Amino acid sequence: MAVQDRSVLVLYGSETGNAQDMAEELGRICQRLHFKSRVEELDVVDLNALLQPKFVIFVISTTGQGDMPHNSLLFWKRLLRKKLPPGCLASVNYTTFGLGDSTYLKFNWAARKLNRRLDQLGAATFIDPYEADEQFPDGLDGSFVRWTGRLYNHFLEHHPAPSGLEPIPDDVILPPKWSLETTIQNSTETNGHVPPSLENIPSSTLLPIPDGWTATLVGNGRLTPEKHWQDVRLISFDVPRRDGVKLACVPGDCLTIYPKNFPQDVQRLITLMEWEDIADKPLDLSQCESLPTNLFTDSKSTLRELLLNNIDFTAIPRRSFLKNMSYFSTNPDHKERLLEFTMAEYLDEYFDYATRSRRSILEVLEEFSSVKLPAERLFDIFPLIRGRDFSIANGGVHQSHPTDENKTRIELLVALVKYRTVLRKPREGLCSRYLDNIPMNSTLTVTRKPVLSPIHGAQNAQRPLVAIATGTGLAPIRALLHERLTQPSPGPMYLFFGNRNREADYFFQQEFDALVTEGQLNVFLAFSRDQRNKIYVQDRLLEEAKRIEEVIFDNGIFCVCGGSTKMADAAKKAVFEPFSEDVKDVEERKKMLASLTWWQEIW
């Protein structure tokens, strides 16, 4: 039983799901200490909600260039309101757990900004905030285990449960946060929906996603040669108007794709868990007391449909999932091994077993075959499928449909994720497999993720641009070039593009060659594997130091996109160091560099 004044609100801001998983685990830790815990994403709550619980714990990652996660922007906007008096949060006792990567320049800035603002408004920390680093030897998981251990001991020492209440042991399963028990019991039909054909193509069901757009797949062409190590696609969608409004995107925006599972994999899981008798019974989800945030499904569904469209059993299992497995194992050896993976002293073994090998949840369940998870706890145990963000690769007039003014044409430059690990079976990303296999003219629900950036618009188009990209980082750069070319008299544009091989990896070569011929674009290429001495974009930047200096003096824009923080850092060094040597006046140099527009999108 939870005592009324023992309440904890756990709030998370998450892009990839790590912060959410950790927030859910914190909620369970607090439950075991007899706190009444509530876990929510930041945008769901208003500021008054911070005043109600005894303690507030924030779990927040940093995205982009020190930005708040997408699902915390509304909360952050509320927190920044100027009319808030300095002591309005004086009764709030809080702490933060920040997730970051020290290879990024603005390490853990989201957590730092949040701490600073909460302090300004009078809130006080009840335990020191923590900044986890992806680069630690034991990664974010190790940091989380150590910090939650300190939090647990702090609560035990300073806020013990009332006399007679001992912490709930780890080997006792907690009540489910979300349960399908009622709706499964109330489904009296024995042969509800007819199972879909086991033709191995993802479901064509349009998901009811808030603010979603219906997109039709109209192009899915491979840009790299068939024998090339990487399969890079130019994927095109047509998006019709929604409620009379046309989809409008600007450079830097992303299109979010929501992948689905494959029918044969779903059947494997149903058979493995012995869910055949209930897999196709109609379920009324409106009978559930609560449902997870970001569960995109109709109220009438089936277990099979939920597995096809919503449940991510291809994800790498987190330690909390393995702990849940242990509760339902009938094999003592299996149970012991699963519990070992959740212990701090066995973090290395968990990393080797799950993370390094990229084992999926389905594969782990097949290996620990004694585990039979109850369907009633589906939402409580399994993660949900998350949308994947892809930078939009076209802009300006190139987003106009060639024949239908009511549609927007969106293009994505996508490198399909296929690789091998220590396991023999090749690994393939869920979204990559989905995009590789959905038929042409399929419809799906997508969303637009706006990215705030200081690089686009008519006024910025007049300024010179230095665009630096590697690999598929060319996507947002191309969108920006498209937009600038629709503006009258755009400023000079310099593209520095790097990849492995000119013949295989020079995306949009014909398009850029034409712009060079027309005098609208200057291109500097760095293909690292085409000669004995490797050449990178930073080398080309150094070769053009005088030109770069002119752009700096002319209030230019610098844009860096790609999949490597090392590349971004090297590019920045190549831009700044020659300039610093040439401009001897220290104050002038500092002033110019401080006012420089530098935007980067690194993933």
From Swiss-Prot:
GO terms for cellular component: cytosol; mitochondrion. Its main location: cytoplasm. The keyword Glycosyltransferase does not apply. Its EC number is 1.18.1.-. FAD binds at R358, R388, D389, F390, S391, G429, L430, C431, S432, W603. Residues 8-152 form the Flavodoxin-like domain. Keywords: Cytoplasm, FAD, Flavoprotein, FMN, Mitochondrion, NADP, Oxidoreductase. NADP(+) binds at T472, S528, R529, K534, I535, Y536, V537, Q538. FMN binds at residues 14-19, 61-64, 99-108, 134. GO terms for molecular function: flavin adenine dinucleotide binding; FMN binding; NADP binding; NADPH-hemoprotein reductase activity. Transmembrane segments: none annotated. Its cofactor is FAD; FMN. It catalyses: 2 oxidized [2Fe-2S]-[protein] + NADPH = 2 reduced [2Fe-2S]-[protein] + NADP(+) + H(+). GO terms for biological process: iron-sulfur cluster assembly. InterPro entries: CysJ-like_FAD-binding, FAD-bd_FR_type, Flavdoxin-like, Flavodoxin/NO_synth, Flavoprot_Pyr_Nucl_cyt_Rdtase, Flavoprotein-like_sf, FNR_nucleotide-bd, NADPH_Cyt_P450_Rdtase_alpha. Residues 210-457 form the FAD-binding FR-type domain. It comes from the Eukaryota. It is found in: Cytoplasm; Mitochondrion. NADPH-dependent reductase which is a central component of the cytosolic iron-sulfur (Fe-S) protein assembly (CIA) machinery. Transfers electrons from NADPH via its FAD and FMN prosthetic groups to the [2Fe-2S] cluster of DRE2, another key component of the CIA machinery. In turn, this reduced cluster provides electrons for assembly of cytosolic iron-sulfur cluster proteins. Positively controls H(2)O(2)-induced cell death. HAMAP family: NDOR1 (MF_03178). Belongs to the NADPH-dependent diflavin oxidoreductase NDOR1 family. In the N-terminal section; belongs to the flavodoxin family. Interacts with DRE2; as part of the cytosolic iron-sulfur (Fe-S) protein assembly (CIA) machinery. This is NADPH-dependent diflavin oxidoreductase 1. It comes from Gibberella zeae (strain ATCC MYA-4620 / CBS 123657 / FGSC 9075 / NRRL 31084 / PH-1) (Wheat head blight fungus).
